[in-house]
Amino acid sequence: MQKNDLVTVAIEDIGVGGEGIGKVDGYTLFIKDAIIGDVVEAKIVKAKKNYGYARLMNIVTPSENRVEKPACPMARRCGGCQIQEMKYGAQLAFKEGKVRGNLERIGEVPTELLDKVMQPIVGMEEPFHYRNKAQFPIGTDKEGHIITGFYAGRTHSIIPNTDCALGVAVNQKILEIILHFMENNHISAYDEEKHKGLVRHVLIRYGFKTDELMVCLVINGEKLPHAEKLVDKLCKISGMTSITISVNKAKTNVIMGNEIKLLWGQTYITDYIGNVKYQISPLSFYQV
């Protein structure tokens, strides 16, 4: 196999990064966005001695477990979701099989014992819009427009998207308010290569039991100009409880700074796990 070869591959497995795995004449290929059961046409982009990587060019025969349309139109470009093309039930079966296989192969747990003690994987009633926390990088596109979204896989290139299918629906409204505020008031986005610009990230938290909302802007400075204009828009959103800034002037990939400054409301939101009440600040660990 050589780079740029065009091959037809039947996908038999999925790798740890969500890439489809298939073989051509015994040669293993890893193909992003292909799922188990697909027969695809792929172009080899990197060829090593015993395996290679290929780009999905065409789906010859789709898997019976392939969805017609992923929930997020950015799924293939964004680095956040790897197997959104697969039906949710098939995702669960794949994950359960991966855990079982690792326990047998790596942990050397006898199959007979697993058959007795391993319970079926428990899925969610709603596998979208379930995350109570999201962190969105802020940047600019080639035309200089301020954008937000998530990074493309293994890059720091932002795929513009304010409507992530994993976060709560109100995130989109919050992000669009912030983007408009920045554009209208000439607030710069942070450039991590030049270490210039002000707004680095936006952190949003939501309490599913309390409906409380938190917005925290991470900035490369001590102050957010015209903050009162942003607060005036955000505080009108139902459930808004906390609006803060996080000061992070370090040249680092660490998102949050240690200093939190209050703009409006309080510095935390509350939520419950069972009967236990939690106070959650911008810096708190709280399972997403």
Regions found by a protein language model. Give the residues of each.
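Accessory RNA-recognition modules of RNA-modification enzymes
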Residues: 1-288
